[in-house]
Amino acid sequence: EQKEKYRELSQKLSLLTLQFSENCLKETNDYLKVITDSTLLSGLPESAITAAKETAQEKGVEGWAFTLHAPSYVPVMTYADNRDLRKEIYMAYNTQCTHDNEHNNLDVVKELANTRMEVAQLLGYKDYASYMLEDRMAQNSEAVYNLLNQLLDAYTPTAKNEYAEVQALARKEAGSGFELMPWDWSYYSNKLKNEKYQINDEML
């Protein structure tokens, strides 16, 4: 009976995982940001502008079209001078599958978490992480958290220094009251890299 229950739960997990992935893919493929004002393209490398023009032609729209796929998304976040454009694309990318449509993954995630807990309890574990980690190097979730805390302690000073540098550059360019937001990070960190080392991501 336990084996049969485990088989049912495993099959359910597989289907939920597949549904989650398919929803993400569909949401990504459905998104299209169309731009007809060329001034919004300021800062973008020629390769990204050309690709956006080709995407627009493929989709049968005027102007330039951007998607949430990495070759389109990354250049906007890294090079687009227009902050509102960066924010719009960033928010679209990071809120995928949370909207009120057929691709919403919120219920899928809840069902995944509940089913994983069922599997763990069926097999005598306190949670799914303990079940998954038993045969791995970490062995349990406590060991994972200990390692993460060690990494946090080790890298926090460096991260704070890097953030301060990027924030300082942003304020130098955009004004003393400028507050760095997630959609600004790639843009200004790339500028800082270029300023310090005369190199940027496009060159790489």
What are these regions (language model features)?
Residues 72-79, 97-102, 133-144, 203:
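Second-shell loop/turn segments in exported
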Residues 58-97, 185, 190-192:
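Active-site-adjacent "gating/activation" loops or surface patches in catalytic cores
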Residues 85, 89, 101-102, 118, ...:
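Surface-exposed loop/turn segments and immediately adjacent short secondary-structure elements
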Residues 4-7, 11-67, 110, 115, ...:
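Active-site-proximal, well-structured secondary-structure segments within enzyme catalytic domains
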Residues 77, 103-115:
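Short, 15-30-residue, compositionally biased linear elements
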